[in-house]
C-alpha cells in the first residue's frame, strides 16, 4: 500500500516538474495573445444608431 502511494507521489512530482519546465521554456509574456486586439472605429451610421 505504501509503494502505491509513493508511486502516485512520484508521478505527481514528475508532472509538476514537467509543467514548470514547460512554463519556463514558453513564458506567457512572449507567447502570442489568443485574441489579437484590433483597431475598431465606429462609422457614422453606427454612431447615429447608438445616439438614437
Curated annotation (Swiss-Prot):
Q: Does the keyword Kinase apply?
A: no
Q: Can the keyword Transmembrane be found in this entry's annotation?
A: no
Q: What species does this protein belong to?
A: Drosophila melanogaster (Fruit fly)
Ranked from the top, the taxonomy reads: Eukaryota, Metazoa, Ecdysozoa, Arthropoda, Hexapoda
Keywords recorded for this protein, A-Z? Behavior, Hormone, Secreted, Signal
Residues making up the signal peptide according to the UniProt record: 1-22
How is this protein annotated for GO cellular component?
Answer: extracellular space
Physiological role: This protein may be a precursor of secreted proteins and peptide hormones.
What turns on this gene?
By mating.
As annotated in Swiss-Prot or TrEMBL, what is the tissue specificity of this protein? Answer: Main cells of the accessory glands of males.
Name of protein: Accessory gland-specific peptide 95EF
Top-level division of the source organism's lineage: Eukaryota
Task: Please give the Gene Ontology molecular function terms for this protein.
Answer: hormone activity
Compartments where located: Secreted
Q: Which gene encodes it?
A: Acp95EF
Which GO terms of type biological process are on file?
A: sexual reproduction
Amino acid at each position: 500500500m505504501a509503494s502505491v502511494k509513493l508511486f502516485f507521489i512520484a508521478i505527481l512530482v514528475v508532472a509538476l516538474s514537467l509543467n514548470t519546465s514547460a512554463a519556463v521554456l514558453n513564458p506567457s509574456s512572449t507567447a502570442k495573445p489568443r485574441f489579437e486586439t484590433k483597431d475598431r472605429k465606429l462609422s457614422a451610421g453606427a454612431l447615429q444608431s447608438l445616439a438614437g
